[in-house]
A protein has these predicted regions:
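Nucleotide-state-sensitive switch-loop elements of NTP-binding domains
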Residues: 2-46, 57, 66-152, 156-166
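Hydrophobic anchor at the beta1->P-loop junction of P-loop NTPases
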Residues: 49-51
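Walker A/P-loop
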Residues: 60
Length: 167
């Protein structure tokens, strides 16, 4: 599969593969990911929204409704749900996607859970690349849901246009 061609066709499977490549710790995957991202124009027509708050405040439930509002306006919505990592496997342990069931079923939505891999700041070290790939795949609204964080972990604010703190 040529990821560049498939991303231009708005293929969600290609987007998933491209994000997996970006998140990989293998050097060869990083090189491929960097080359892929560099092929896309550096335009930013999307709206990037960061959503943060303490664990259990309702971030995923809010995103479920918020994302549907954008879809009803004719927008394509990507959600990058950053979860805490298992110390053993470094994989995601919560699975916020299950709390966005209706949004996940919509053909104009893409939800990607990703582990933070122990990185502080509420996001992963590859969240920026994931945002760029979602933009390349034609998403109008990109929502980044952080790990439930405290007030000092606001790295996401450097990656988004709008930051929402749920309390």
């Amino acid at each position: 599969m040529d990821l560049f061609i498939e991303l231009n066709k708005r293929n969600n499977r290609a987007l998933s593969k491209a994000i997996t490549l970006a998140e990989s710790s293998l050097e060869k995957d990083q090189i491929l990911s960097d080359k892929l991202i560099s092929k896309f124009p550096k335009k930013n027509d999307s709206i990037r929204i960061g959503i943060t708050g303490i664990p259990g405040v309702g971030k995923s439930s809010f995103i479920e409704k918020f994302g549907q509002k954008f879809i009803h306006q004719g927008k394509k919505v990507a959600v990058l749900a950053i979860d805490p990592s298992s110390e053993k496997s470094q994989g995601s342990i919560l699975g916020d996607k299950s709390r966005m069931e209706n949004l996940a079923k919509n053909k104009n939505a893409f939800i990607r859970p990703s582990a933070n891999k122990g990185i502080l700041g509420g996001v992963s070290n590859k969240t920026r690349d994931s945002i760029l790939l979602c933009e390349a795949a034609g998403y109008d609204v990109i929502i980044v849901e952080t790990v439930g964080v405290g007030q000092s972990e606001t790295t996401v604010s450097k990656l988004v246009d709008i930051m929402l703190l749920l309390t």
